[in-house]
């Protein structure tokens, strides 16, 4: 067993050996056979020595004192530790080598003696295989058994007993009668339930243990309870708090940000060639932004997000016509089938199963059946119609998919409502702050009040609110849609009320008005019928395309021997805006980038910046002049703009990437 036990032994022993039969006769009191048949029966023993029958009586309310407070009885004939048979029990050195102990047991054999004494002993007992063969092991076990229920405080993981100092404890027990059974066998049944089994380290008989029983006449002493960690110091780490941390974070999701009007998990198809579907945490806020994150944790930390501006986007559902956005509180009944199925592939097999969004319901009837290839990393998703897409004004597309029809329709309804709300209040925050300035409002009003700007440049509709920057004209909202279809290389459309208007753009619009532009773009329109406010869209579109795209009504070039590029250089040097606009309308990109002769190497942009004319500089850039060009001296247009101290020209050149040599 190998355990070191400190105990007190105070038995009243009465041993009587039968000289004739070689056994001990029982006394008048009830007897009990202890250790008659145990595993130590096969150990080497002297022939004359036989197992002893003992009668142990312990007085009631017996308080034991420490061994140093007691004196040895005078009637003690000899020291029990000097007995060769007890030498292995009462060792002075409890850590004596086991081999030496076994050798001593084999050599020291003595005959039985007759004695009847009382001992008051306290010693360190080293229980091992050699100790198990000693004659006084029975008394030792009995004494230790009486001591254990009162002194055990805790039990280690390896089931090792630890008895505190005996001086600090006292005990009182009733009279215990250990009797011997008449049939010859015996066990310590009265105390077996109080003795915890200790694993033995012996290799000879590893299965030896005290047999447990349930019928115990003496009450079982309660073991000391382990202190719980409920009252531990707050300085240490609390694992329960750490486990509950994610739950506490759920209460503060999105703290410090706008509360989403709808949020949840959706599948999103990647834009790569693999076209895999991955789970995303999607939020829809009242600011007109649809944001998706890789996970809920990223949303809580507000990292790795991507936003979609719904103000310039639309939503589409496969197989359905776009419907008007309704209130978010109005229930929408989903159709059983939208008539369109599409084979798509998905990402991880388990990614289809996820928690639904907060404001959507889940129908178990509409859940797709589990795929037989769910354990694979990728599999094809067949005929899934719970998807929708968002298309931006630039043509970019985002594909999303919900778990059910109801959830998809709830997302579509919420997004459509937000798109409508964004369009109704589509003034940008920057334009709002600028329009609050009285000076800018007066500048825009002055542009509208200029000659010819009170009517649309193409259909004569009153009070136009839209403009074409490179043409320098104002137009109605219907004609502005047609101008958008021409492309930005022909017409750059902006709103007077919704877009930003920096100083250089306001100067361009103030320099070119509708009458000046029509004198150039409609210079040869004699005999043509110009559309009016009541004309159809087809008639307006036909006129606009003929006027700006085909240039059928463009005024002719002046008769001169100079090339168009040289004429443009001269018009720029003379700051002749009308002639420059006419030349730019007729010219090509090569002619616009023509340089001055005589080894100067200056382009029209160099000349415009030397003059500090931001209107001509801006028009030249819009018509394709090279902002990176250098003259014969290696100077860029920005160098001449700095020499002219024209901050407007400097801002325009830096905006379009002209190299800044001063940096």
Swiss-Prot record:
UniProt-listed InterPro entries: Ankyrin_rpt, Ankyrin_rpt-contain_sf, Arf-GAP_GTPase_ANK_PH, ARFGAP/RecO, ArfGAP_dom, ArfGAP_dom_sf, PH-like_dom_sf, PH_domain
C4-type Zn finger ranges: 456-479
Protein name per Swiss-Prot or TrEMBL: Arf-GAP with GTPase, ANK repeat and PH domain-containing protein 6
Alphabetized PANTHER family for the sequence: ARF-GAP WITH GTPASE, ANK REPEAT AND PH DOMAIN-CONTAINING PROTEIN 4-RELATED, CENTAURIN-GAMMA-1A
Residues covered by the PH domain: 259-420
Functional summary from the UniProt entry: Putative GTPase-activating protein.
Family: Belongs to the centaurin gamma-like family.
Alphabetized UniProt keyword annotations: ANK repeat, GTPase activation, Metal-binding, Repeat, Zinc, Zinc-finger
